[in-house]
Amino acid sequence: TRAEQVRRTDLAQKARRMILSHMKVEAEDETSLTLDHRGYYMQISFSTLHPLLAVCLAKAIRNPDGARKQQLANELNLHSVLGSHAINEDVGCYSYRATHWLDTELTPERFFEILSRCVDEADRGYFNLAG
């Protein structure tokens, strides 16, 4: 409904403002915020249609090619409930992407809890694949 779409847009805008007030954002556009966070290039995106908050963490990885690393990424994904691990051989980077429902107002405490879990999972994936 129209009322639900307005509510979802409002939730996304409030979440965006909260993140902007708590983090040093380097760039932004109508759907995403980008910044450096704990050694990762991070993109936070908002979808008002669903409503979703997506966090993508990326980091350069040496020797990204190879069937072994792709198999390891697939194994990580079998055990990763909230997100997915990937290796982009073309640009030589590892990424972890997690999506969370944005169905209630996002508090700073909840955002940083989500972010901490995302970074922990990204670290786990990166160290398994880079090692």
Per-segment meaning from a language model:
Residues R7-A15, P64-K69, R110, I114-R117, ...:
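Short amphipathic alpha-helical segments
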Residues C56-R97:
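Short, internal acidic amphipathic alpha-helical interface segments
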Residues M42-I61:
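A short acidic-to-branched-hydrophobic micro-motif
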Residues Y40-I44, L102-E105:
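Short, charged/polar, Gly/Pro-enriched secondary-structure boundary elements
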Residues M18, H22, L72-H79, I114-N128:
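Conserved short hydrophobic interaction patches
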Residues N88-D120, R124-G131:
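Well-ordered alpha/beta subsegment
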Residues T31-L33, P51-L53, G92-Y94:
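Hydrophobic residues embedded in beta-strands of well-ordered beta-sheets
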Residues T1-Q43, S84-N88:
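Charge-rich, low-complexity N-terminal segments
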